[in-house]
Amino acid sequence: MSYQYGQGYSGPGGNAPQWQQPPRAPYAGGPAAGQYGSPYGSAPPGQQYGGGSPYGSYGQPGPRAPYGGGQAPGGPYGGYGQPQGGPYRQQGSAGNVPPGVNPEAYQWFSTVDSDQSGYINAKELKQALMNFNNSSFNDETCIMMLNMFDKTKSGRVDVFGFSALWTFLQQWRAAFQQFDRDRSGSINTNEMHQALSQMGYNLSPQFIQELVNRYSVRGGTGVLQLDRFIQVCTQLQSMTQAFREKDTGMTGNVRMSYEDFLSSAITRLM
């Protein structure tokens, strides 16, 4: 089943915004105004959140949560391109970039589209995406992101969808770098707690520990690579939106039937 994210987008309108949350977005993780019509599963929240409101109990940001950039560990594309020497080292030509498409994203599209079909599928996307430890992105995250920007629900994206996906990755990569305090190339439990707190989520350390353990690589050291960080944060945004839709009184509490809960989860996570 395709995700509901990103349906009806018109393509990105230029370069990725530099962590600047538009005034209209009233809560953590809201999309920039006019971007793809997606109420959840969007890029990370920006520097300016606007005023406060009663959503603090489950994801409302506090005022002015600062994010920053910084040099990514690893290769020049810091986690969303192949490392130097890999099969995608030579990028495609930047000529004839369609209007509204990021030129750098176009170069990557030209290279990643290995069958020259004019579309990128999940297999091609996975071949192009690397974590900071040079491991490939997991299948779940690749499919999730592809579906977010799959306008036609065909299991693939054209150059406009890829440009939007590329911008999405840029923004989440910057968030990952910001919260990777020890520059290890991964996010541990303490760093994840800081990240989610600054994004506006009021979650217990115990829950975050369980979250990290659940999504960390089996047999690993209890840390999140970039792919899992994106997956966790995106799904958390989605479920928070589902909760918010039911919380009409903005109290931080809702009553719903078991089937309603399952419907909300299935709609957003399948």
UniProtKB/Swiss-Prot annotation:
GO terms for molecular function: calcium ion binding; calcium-dependent protein binding; ubiquitin-like ligase-substrate adaptor activity. It comes from the Eukaryota. Calcium-binding protein that acts as an adapter that bridges unrelated proteins or stabilizes weak protein-protein complexes in response to calcium. Acts as a negative regulator of ER-Golgi transport. Heterodimer; heterodimerizes (via the EF-hand 5) with pdcd6. Residues 67-84 have a biased composition (Gly residues). Residues 1-97 are annotated as: Disordered. Its main location: cytoplasm. Residues 26-47, 55-66 have a biased composition (Low complexity). GO terms for cellular component: COPII vesicle coat; Cul3-RING ubiquitin ligase complex; endoplasmic reticulum. Sequence repeats lie at residues 22-30, 44-54, 62-70, 72-81, 83-91. Residues 100-135, 141-169, 170-202, 203-239, 240-269 form the EF-hand domain. Residues 22-91 are annotated as: 5 X 9 AA approximate tandem repeat of [AP]-P-G-G-P-Y-G-G-P-P. CDD domains: EFh_PEF_peflin. It is found in: Cytoplasm; Endoplasmic reticulum; Membrane; Cytoplasmic vesicle, COPII-coated vesicle membrane. InterPro entries: EF-hand-dom_pair, EF_Hand_1_Ca_BS, EF_hand_dom, Peflin/Sorcin_CaBP. SMART domains: EFh. The keyword rRNA processing does not apply. Ca(2+) 1 binds at D113, D115, S117, Y119, E124. PANTHER family: PEFLIN. This is Peflin.
